[in-house]
Structures are given as structure tokens and as C-alpha cells.
Amino acid sequence: MENQEVVLSIDAIQEPEQIKFNMSLKNQSERAIEFQFSTGQKFELVVYDSEHKERYRYSKEKMFTQAFQNLTLESGETYDFSDVWKEVPEPGTYEVKVTFKGRAENLKQVQAVQQFEVK
């Protein structure tokens, strides 16, 4: 999903016993963008079923460091990250919502939503 200067994309891949999510944040601006994080958590990922019931949340039962961190993306640079849902739910249509937790000056929070099929 676009956010003027950065684009967040999601690719959901069904594997035999899990769903893998590959995500990519691309700086499409002409300048470097510095993101600040207040914890070690770089993103949140939530999967919903067709009734909008939450089925998976990346941060559930995880602990993150409480340390400030920075990430600088140069113009044209991409930051790739991933997560694995160690379950294959029943067949159907699901929605994944990813929120990039980094904050940058003059940018809204970066999010993307995408539907995917489980067969």
C-alpha cells in the first residue's frame, strides 16, 4: 500500500505446514528516510478470516526490547522482512494486515492490507 514516499508490499506463500509472509518496504522518494523504533518490534502482522476474526498475530506471546533503534532507507532502497505462521488454516479467503512500526518525520504510519487464499 502506498504512503506517498514509501511502499509496503506483502506476499503470502502457502507451504505444506505453514504460511510464510514476505514483506518489503521500499523508499520511492528522492531522499533518505530515517525511521525510529521505540522497541525491538519492527512490524505487526495480523491475519483475519472471512468473518474478520483474528486468527494470528505476530506479536502475541512475544517480548520485545525497550530500546530505541533507527533504520535509514536511502532513496530507492528496500528493507525486506518476513514472518511465518506455523499453521495452515482451513481453506478460504484471509486478510493480512501489516503495520510497519517505524516512525519517520512527515510520514504517516505505513500499513498494507492484502487478501490471500488458503487451498
Curated annotation (Swiss-Prot):
Any Pfam family hit: BsuPI
Q: Name one GO molecular function term.
A: serine-type endopeptidase inhibitor activity
Q: Which Gene3D superfamilies match?
A: Intracellular proteinase inhibitor BsuPI (2.60.40.2360)
Its subcellular locations are: Cytoplasm
Q: Name one GO cellular component term.
A: cytoplasm
Which residue ranges run through the membrane?
none
Q: Which UniProt keywords apply?
A: Cytoplasm, Protease inhibitor, Serine protease inhibitor
The record lists its disulfide bonds as: none
- Give a short account of what the protein does: Directly regulates the major intracellular proteinase (ISP-1) activity in vivo. Inhibits ISP-1 in the early stages of sporulation. It may be then inactivated by a membrane-bound proteinase.
What is the recorded name of this protein? Intracellular proteinase inhibitor
Print the organism lineage: Bacteria, Bacillati, Bacillota, Bacilli, Bacillales
Q: Could you tell me the gene encoding this protein?
A: ipi
